[in-house]
Amino acid sequence: MSLMKEMLSVGVHFGHKKAFWNPQMKEYIFGINHGVHIINLEKTVPLFQDAVNFVGKTVANGGKILFVGTKRQAQDIVEAEAKRCGMSFVSHRWLGGMLTNYKTVRQSIKRLAQLEKMREDGTLESLTKKEMLQNIRTIEKLEKVLGGIKEMGGLPDAIVVIDSNKEHIAIQEAQKLGIKVVAIVDTNSNPEGIDYIIPGNDDAVKSISFYMKKFADAVIDAQGLDRAVEAKADEAAQA
């Protein structure tokens, strides 16, 4: 099946109601059907391919990708696909300063690691019941917000965002730090300042699954390429 047909089958072309449009998305709109803007997939297909290729190249060069999708219908998909390809993710709430104040965030990640170790080795059980419950609540709270980035080990090289409107703070932080931004941009969104714009439906579960699967597959393919290059380098060094 062609990429265009795949996109049509999962509803990537359905935008928002005409009343909610952002005029800056005009060049990506094909027309209107029953009061809903229809996205021009002839524009979306090459832009999506460019974005997927960029993600793959970034990973092949040893870079890190952070997937961001905190809206209800994106949360589980973003988490599952990010885990499948071994990349970091934010799927519950974007903590202000998650990128721009990463030093402080890193301290919270260290705290989470310490508490998890205490839980694993039984240290928590030696505390009073009140202290133990407080620490367990802290673990749950930190895990919910930071669990997806605790293995990131530094700032990402790029972020991939589902819904540029909802994740505008994440995008602003990435822009401030010169981190590349890949984003699904619906007809009600502002495409300004996004490095890799993907005009498309950011609400339908099938569309979100489609994007995330393609990105995760690109990461996995690139990791295989990266390992193959490393293996060749090792062989050359031993020769």
From Swiss-Prot:
Keywords: Ribonucleoprotein, Ribosomal protein. Coiled coil: none annotated. Pfam families: Ribosomal_S2. InterPro entries: Ribosomal_uS2, Ribosomal_uS2_bac/mit/plastid, Ribosomal_uS2_flav_dom_sf. GO terms for cellular component: cytosolic small ribosomal subunit. This is Small ribosomal subunit protein uS2. The gene is rpsB. PANTHER family: 30S RIBOSOMAL PROTEIN S2 PROKARYOTIC AND ORGANELLAR, SMALL RIBOSOMAL SUBUNIT PROTEIN US2M. GO terms for biological process: translation. The keyword Ribosomal protein applies. Belongs to the universal ribosomal protein uS2 family. GO terms for molecular function: structural constituent of ribosome. Transmembrane segments: none annotated.
